[in-house]
Design a protein with these regions (language model features):
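Active-site histidine-anchored catalytic micro-motif
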Residues: 16-27, 45
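Short glycine/serine- and small hydrophobic-enriched flexible loop segments
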Residues: 26-31, 70-74
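A glycine/threonine-rich phosphate-anchoring loop and its flanking beta-alpha core
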Residues: 8-9, 33, 46
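Hydrophobic helix-and-loop "lid/oligomerization" segment in the mid-to-C-terminal part
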Residues: 47, 52-209
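Internal alpha/beta core interface subdomains
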Residues: 27-28, 39-52
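Flexible, glycine/proline-enriched loop segments at strand-loop-helix junctions
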Residues: 13-16, 55-56
């Protein structure tokens, strides 16, 4: 550059089908130069991000996801350390268990309320409980309601049969086909559950889901 200034460079990486940002970072590191080495704690962190966003490699995990994971393992990512890093406390575990225990099955949808008392991040626990409900045979999608800070947070999950994004969009939210959410205000949990049921009924009648 004539003025002697170094121009800024930007790398734009757009992969809508990537499992996570951590996968893309690992992929860039892998090919940015030969024989690159990263610290084990950095590898652990990136690996943990992939594990979280893919729900233990069960959601949106493609061949390149596993290639990124293999690269991180070669660079010191330790699955035992990562597992310990991702463990929750007893209150979180009990809350998830209560959410699953009290779930209602409505037209192949598992609906439940996640208790928020005593939890540091109740909305995260609610999302984790929604994932757990998909492990039940016959459940096409799950929606967990978490009341926190005067707002009802909806965490919707599915595997491949229901586009939960469409349901959440009807409720003012959004997301992706298998992972979506919404927020409801100025109503009780009972009214929120009734609203979701009516939305499911309406969309099924319309053939929208």
């Amino acid at each position: 550059i004539g003025s002697g200034l170094v121009g800024s460079e930007m790398c734009i990486r757009d992969r809508p089908y990537a499992s996570s940002a951590c996968e893309m970072v690992a992929e860039i590191l892998q090919y940015i130069c030969d024989n690159i080495r990263i610290k084990s704690i950095e590898a652990d962190t990136l690996y943990a991000g992939i594990v979280i966003d893919t729900n233990n490699f069960t959601n949106k995990a493609g061949a390149r996801t596993f290639e990124a994971a293999a690269f991180l393992r070669r660079n010191g990512a330790d699955i035992v350390r990562v597992r310990k890093l991702l463990r929750g406390d007893m209150n979180e575990y009990k809350a998830k268990a209560e959410t699953v225990r009290h779930a209602e099955v409505y037209k192949h949808y598992a609906l439940s309320v996640c208790p928020s008392s005593g939890l540091q991040s109740p909305t995260i626990v609610g999302a984790q409980a929604a994932n757990e409900l998909l492990n039940i045979t016959g459940i096409k999608a799950s929606i967990v309601f978490t009341y926190y800070n005067d707002t009802i947070y909806l965490s919707a999950r599915s595997i491949d049969e229901v586009n939960v994004q469409l349901i959440m969009e009807r409720l003012g939210g959004g997301g992706h086909m298998t992972i979506a959410g919404a927020q409801l205000k100025d109503m009780s949990l009972e009214d929120a559950i009734t609203l979701v049921k009516k939305t499911i009924d309406t969309m099924e009648t319309e053939g929208a889901i």
